[in-house]
């Protein structure tokens, strides 16, 4: 029989439950340059003071638990705890508050978005004292962002690889997204690329299904790329979706794409996971592949205004995890995206330094130092009449992706691609000549359609198409 032992708590330990705000609400705290800062939209349960709710978020996403524990005495709580250092009411919302929380850098593993999110957006989102909780923004200090590789290549390197400058890049998602055989799929890719597009794309749920196994698709798409390049003299690409059920299978697909000599692969980074995405991004940099990122599943996380996580946080996480393109809404198409908010996180993807600007939803100044930028992709329900607005809103460093707006052309895929390329070139030229695309955009398209029958046909077929719904993602 083992001897009876007794563990004595340290002097000063007092068991029981105490208010979080006694330890984790510290309005006098001065944030450090190395702190990771978070802005949470907090909706407390009735009767819970906002200070207690904010402190609870800080505690449960860092060192705290529901009761006092004697092992607190074995470490420095002041060094490692998260701190709710400010709370402000949300204008127009009676029971919502923005709680600002500072986390010391040592709480997080270097170079791991997975670990960062496990703490900051982990169990705390199921906390009973809160009716709802949304992470609006994060400030990632250079001391932490420099532990990440970031995008495999970035905007300038991609332009140099493709030898394409001075305009947005043009893409197209192949439709129908499911059901085509690999050979017919490759044929659609070829028609779009020879018509003038820079890229074509696997849809997010094209992986390796019975009707089209991944290896067959990769081979036929590579054939289409090389044939279109030979005919046009331009470098072309197709986003070959390497997303798979295991990381090993994903890497096998990326390796095969590299062996085929194609320029770019694709990953669904939310459904695939940040660990898989970061692994793929490292492989892409080491092997000269560009990496296109699809955000499938993002609206499950970011669409509700009072619970979840804003896409600007997912965008920052992707820039650290690694990707050269990411879908970012259109402002004018069928998918969610309000202009000022969308441009806020577009700047967070592309620029080196972004000032705090609450009018665009940016809660913190963000300094990426030398981390490469990510090209935002505008995709979803857009067509030639949207081209002036897209050119004006997103600028040159973007990818404009027309799926139905290419493949739905009455004359076929190649004429659809021609129409989009002519419209884009006309808008870029008009902008460079000093014309106001916001006011004169439709006239620019009409003028170009006079000498392009492909564009004229596209203008006619989509002249009445509009997606006029109020955006959910507003400030």
UniProtKB/Swiss-Prot annotation:
Catalysed reactions, semicolon-separated: 2 (2R)-3-phosphoglycerate + 2 H(+) = D-ribulose 1,5-bisphosphate + CO2 + H2O; D-ribulose 1,5-bisphosphate + O2 = 2-phosphoglycolate + (2R)-3-phosphoglycerate + 2 H(+)
Pfam family membership, one: RuBisCO_large
Role of this protein: RuBisCO catalyzes two reactions: the carboxylation of D-ribulose 1,5-bisphosphate, the primary event in carbon dioxide fixation, as well as the oxidative fragmentation of the pentose substrate in the photorespiration process. Both reactions occur simultaneously and in competition at the same active site.
Active site per database record: 175 (proton acceptor), 294 (proton acceptor)
Modified residues (N-acetylproline): 3
Native source species: Picea sitchensis
Additional remark text: The basic functional RuBisCO is composed of a large chain homodimer in a 'head-to-tail' conformation. In form I RuBisCO this homodimer is arranged in a barrel-like tetramer with the small subunits forming a tetrameric 'cap' on each end of the 'barrel'.
Modified residues (N6-carboxylysine): 201
GO biological process, one term: reductive pentose-phosphate cycle
Record-given protein name: Ribulose bisphosphate carboxylase large chain
Record's subunit section: Heterohexadecamer of 8 large chains and 8 small chains; disulfide-linked. The disulfide link is formed within the large subunit homodimers.
